[in-house]
Amino acid sequence: MTKVGLRIDVDTLRGTREGVPRLLATLHRHGVQASFFFSVGPDNMGRHLWRLIRPRFLWKMLRSNAASLYGWDILLAGTAWPGKNIGNANAGIIRETATYHETGLHAWDHHAWQTHSGHWSIRQLEEDIARGITALEAIIGKPVTCSAAAGWRADGRVVRAKESFNLRYNSDCRGTTLFRPLLMPGQTGTPQIPVTLPTWDEVIGPAVQAQSFNTWIISRMLQDKGTPVYTIHAEVEGIVHQPLFEDLLVRARDAGITFCPLGELLPASPESLPLGQIVRGHIPGREGWLGCQQAASAS
């Protein structure tokens, strides 16, 4: 049996309002639990449209047919009008999710984090994280124990900024296996659970067709030599591609794959995890930099 961590990112108002309820119903039908990471502040995702001037981002949007994939309400959110507060508008849905699934913070403002966190100071990072955690805890009525950086925009500064929140783990980067980030010689931070597998929008196109994606990604899960972690998005697999995701759950079960919340991947003694660090890097299919796992020495 292959155990795969299932991470569900919720970036937008529509993803929370429409995608999450469908995903909850789908997961319930198949007896699967996952980790949901919510954006809880303003939905300003439409402000990413300026990035269309960048060839790699434009190609990604064309390759994934973004208008039909996400919908124009997502693509224009926060452009001609102020972005609506996601958490306030969908508190009931978020609370229901936290009743059945591991629930953590994705971002206060997904667009702001993805656009500006790379040059924020440690204090600005801490204030933004605190704002999101405070809002999410007020909604779910219990402590937030995990987080996942929006767009995988993370580096050593983000690791340090999250240390004061006493989280059980973070999932801030792409990599191969769980690790303890090295803060300084002799001091390690909160365990990291990297995403190891590509997302739908990173690979779909000429190389991998939509109808063959499930077969392709299951093969990648079975071949993963580290600790497999797969990310879906409420805006994609929870709405337009919900039937495809349901088919994936069936095929994965038949292939001997068991999905689980990311927290279940942690060992009883996190001190046994290898050391590592998060550095800025790039991966195929995703525009811009993101946090990538790198080995580190204890000395």
From Swiss-Prot:
GO cellular component, one term: membrane
UniProt KW keywords: Antibiotic resistance, Hydrolase, Lipid A biosynthesis, Lipid biosynthesis, Lipid metabolism, Lipopolysaccharide biosynthesis
Pathway assignment: Glycolipid biosynthesis; 4-amino-4-deoxy-alpha-L-arabinose undecaprenyl phosphate biosynthesis; 4-amino-4-deoxy-alpha-L-arabinose undecaprenyl phosphate from UDP-4-deoxy-4-formamido-beta-L-arabinose and undecaprenyl phosphate: step 2/2; Bacterial outer membrane biogenesis; lipopolysaccharide biosynthesis
All copies of domain NodB homology, residue ranges: 2-260
EC number of this enzyme: 3.5.1.n3
Cited Gene3D superfamilies: Glycoside hydrolase/deacetylase
Protein name: Probable 4-deoxy-4-formamido-L-arabinose-phosphoundecaprenol deformylase ArnD
Record family assignment: Belongs to the polysaccharide deacetylase family. ArnD deformylase subfamily.
Molecular function GO terms recorded: hydrolase activity, acting on carbon-nitrogen (but not peptide) bonds, in linear amides
Top EC class, one word: hydrolase
InterPro entries named in the record: ArnD (IPR023557), Glyco_hydro/deAcase_b/a-brl (IPR011330), NODB_dom (IPR002509), Polysacc_deacetylase_ArnD (IPR050248)
Function: Catalyzes the deformylation of 4-deoxy-4-formamido-L-arabinose-phosphoundecaprenol to 4-amino-4-deoxy-L-arabinose-phosphoundecaprenol. The modified arabinose is attached to lipid A and is required for resistance to polymyxin and cationic antimicrobial peptides.
Signal peptide (UniProt feature, chain positions): none
Single GO biological process annotation from the record: 4-amino-4-deoxy-alpha-L-arabinopyranosyl undecaprenyl phosphate biosynthetic process
Gene: arnD
NCBIfam families for the chain: PRK15394.1
Catalyzed reaction equations: 4-deoxy-4-formamido-alpha-L-arabinopyranosyl di-trans,octa-cis-undecaprenyl phosphate + H2O = 4-amino-4-deoxy-alpha-L-arabinopyranosyl di-trans,octa-cis-undecaprenyl phosphate + formate
Pfam families, alphabetized: Polysacc_deac_1
